[in-house]
């Protein structure tokens, strides 16, 4: 399985995301550019330039018309996917940590960091109402006084958002009323990443407590646990098989103070039903920060602390593989 190596960032990758068709791969890093690549051959299609700080998150809508990015320059920006033109600049008081389009692509949500005396907020803006963008006035802002949001995704049908917090809590916020519909605490440390399954019925979390867990999207019921011996930075669910892929590794500042075993940086494949690991893919020099499955399930990509993105196309053996418990 020879990867395609994408070199378009000078700093470590923060998030990677495929569009729904899977022909484009969007990557952001701790440098100010948002890159878009052809996923089939790794050719760079272009960049979205405008941010002046590290970009923490990126999302693309259902029909690949708009791209959303959130950055440490205290702004969330909306781009025209095809031309790279900036359509909207939404300024905030602190860094934008997570962002996302709802199912229809009409409503965006983004969350800001708790820093410099400012509270963590989740903001919702309806793109059909130009005054909300011009006046930078979200139709709803939910304060998170307890613990800041470190990852968030839209739930099924755009009815709510699922947010993971620094203290390991998972909250479900209603996109209509802003109330907390559901709240659980299955992780003991920060939740680094949340990704939903293709049909939005389940989602998988990745946490600093060295586990990744599978939950029901509607009830937040805990289904499965995938254990590792190092912090998990990202996890993704295969759209065609009962597989999840986990990526992580020790933070750069802790590497010298821990045993060498924890410093390993492979992508690890687990079977969902049996919670068993069945494969590993080496490659990155440093921790893996973000993972994404291609929507057709025939390849996956990983972005690492080394600033590279790798696109891996699975070998034929992967598709013939039968898991025996």
UniProtKB/Swiss-Prot annotation:
Cite the InterPro entries for this sequence: eIF3i, WD40/YVTN_repeat-like_dom_sf, WD40_repeat_CS, WD40_repeat_dom_sf, WD40_rpt
Q: Where in the cell is it found?
A: Cytoplasm
Keywords, comma-separated and alphabetical? Cytoplasm, Initiation factor, Protein biosynthesis, Repeat, WD repeat
Chief location category: cytoplasm
> Does Kinase show up as a keyword for this record?
no
Q: Which GO terms describe its molecular function?
A: translation initiation factor activity
- Keyword Repeat: yes or no? yes
Family listed: Belongs to the eIF-3 subunit I family.
Q: Which purpose does this protein serve, as stated in its record?
A: Component of the eukaryotic translation initiation factor 3 (eIF-3) complex, which is involved in protein synthesis of a specialized repertoire of mRNAs and, together with other initiation factors, stimulates binding of mRNA and methionyl-tRNAi to the 40S ribosome. The eIF-3 complex specifically targets and initiates translation of a subset of mRNAs involved in cell proliferation.
| HAMAP family, alphabetized | eIF3i
Give the multimer and partner information: Component of the eukaryotic translation initiation factor 3 (eIF-3) complex, which is composed of 13 subunits: eif3a, eif3b, eif3c, eif3d, eif3e, eif3f, eif3g, eif3h, eif3i, eif3j, eif3k, eif3l and eif3m.
Name this protein carries in UniProt: Eukaryotic translation initiation factor 3 subunit I
Q: Which species does this protein come from?
A: Xenopus tropicalis (Western clawed frog)
């Amino acid at each position: 399985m020879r990867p395609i190596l994408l070199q378009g960032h000078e700093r470590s990758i923060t998030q990677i995301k495929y569009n729904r068709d899977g022909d484009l791969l969007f990557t952001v890093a701790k440098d100010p550019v948002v890159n878009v690549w052809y996923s089939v051959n790794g050719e760079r299609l272009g960049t979205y330039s405008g941010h002046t700080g590290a970009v923490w998150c990126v999302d693309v809508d259902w029909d690949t018309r708009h791209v959303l990015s959130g950055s440490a320059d205290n702004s969330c920006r909306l781009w025209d996917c095809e031309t790279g033109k900036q359509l909207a600049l939404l300024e905030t008081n602190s860094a934008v940590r997570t962002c996302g389009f709802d199912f229809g692509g009409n409503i965006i949500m983004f969350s800001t960091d708790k820093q410099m005396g400012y509270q963590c907020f989740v903001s919702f803006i309806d793109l059909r109402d130009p005054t909300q963008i011009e006046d930078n006035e979200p139709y709803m802002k939910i304060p998170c006084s307890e613990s800041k949001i470190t990852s968030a995704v839209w739930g099924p049908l755009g009815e709510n958002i699922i947010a993971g917090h620094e203290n390991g809590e998972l909250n479900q916020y209603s996109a209509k009323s802003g109330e907390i519909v559901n709240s659980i605490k299955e992780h003991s440390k920060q939740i680094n990443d949340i990704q939903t399954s293709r049909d939005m019925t389940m989602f998988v979390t990745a946490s600093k407590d060295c586990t990744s867990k599978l939950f029901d999207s509607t009830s937040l019921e805990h289904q499965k646990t995938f254990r590792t011996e190092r912090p998990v930075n990202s996890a993704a669910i295969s759209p065609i098989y009962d597989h999840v892929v986990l990526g992580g590794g020790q933070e750069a500042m802790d590497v010298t103070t821990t045993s060498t075993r924890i410093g390993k940086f492979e992508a690890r494949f687990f079977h969902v039903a049996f919670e068993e690991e069945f494969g590993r893919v080496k490659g990155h020099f440093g921790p893996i920060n973000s993972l994404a499955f291609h929507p057709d399930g025939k390849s996956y990509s990983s972005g690492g602390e080394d600033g590279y993105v790798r696109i891996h196309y699975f070998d034929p053996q992967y598709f013939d593989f039968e898991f025996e418990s």
